[in-house]
């Protein structure tokens, strides 16, 4: 993926190509754009060496545990949550990232079902029933795995109210910009405009 693309990029003569991997740059940018204050502070604390990384924190917040108790495998679940759900991804996005990171979805489902609240499981089961009623795809997942992914999605969104509001506001502003060419619509630090 990234390494494959890097091999296609060559610096021009006299220039140097520098490769860098910025720690959770997607999450940092999104937290800043959305004004997700608790998360911005968590990044600051992580950078200062006084708090856990955000992948551990994502898992801990969803499974009602402490970041210190999060194992390497559990951190991977947190990573998938952060990367797959941050830009309005749902179960399908979670599934895609889980495949990339070779997660065992049955193990994931077991972890979720053994720790999630009855209310969270019931809400996710309700969403699954709605998806089936509307004849939408369940992506070949078992009901148990689908519900687990839905629980994680809902938990992530509950923990990120400013990010969810940003999605809604950007969507509305894009539609307004399309309907009103030449007019600029602002959402926090973003300016959305269609010309022509």
Task: List each model region and its residues.
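Conserved catalytic core of nucleotide polymerization and phosphodiester-bond processing enzymes
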Residues: 1-196
């Amino acid at each position: 993926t990234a390494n494959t693309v890097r091999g296609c990029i060559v610096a021009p003569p006299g220039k140097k190509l520098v490769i860098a991997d910025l720690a959770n740059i997607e999450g940092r940018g999104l937290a800043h754009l959305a004004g997700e204050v608790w998360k911005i502070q968590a990044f600051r604390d992580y950078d200062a060496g006084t708090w856990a990384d955000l992948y551990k924190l994502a898992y801990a917040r969803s499974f009602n545990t402490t970041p210190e108790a999060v194992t390497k495998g559990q951190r991977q679940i947190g990573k998938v949550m952060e990367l797959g759900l941050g830009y309005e991804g749902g179960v399908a996005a979670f599934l895609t990232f889980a495949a990339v990171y070779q997660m065992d979805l049955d193990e994931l489902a077991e972890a979720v079902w053994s720790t999630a609240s009855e209310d969270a499981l019931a809400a996710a089961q309700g969403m699954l029933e709605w998806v089936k009623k509307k004849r939408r795809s369940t992506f070949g997942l078992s009901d148990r795995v689908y519900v687990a992914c839905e629980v994680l999605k809902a938990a992530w969104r509950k923990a990120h109210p400013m990010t969810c509001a940003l999605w809604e506001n950007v969507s509305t502003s894009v539609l307004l910009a399309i309907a009103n060419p030449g007019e600029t619509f602002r959402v926090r630090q973003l300016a959305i405009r269609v010309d022509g």
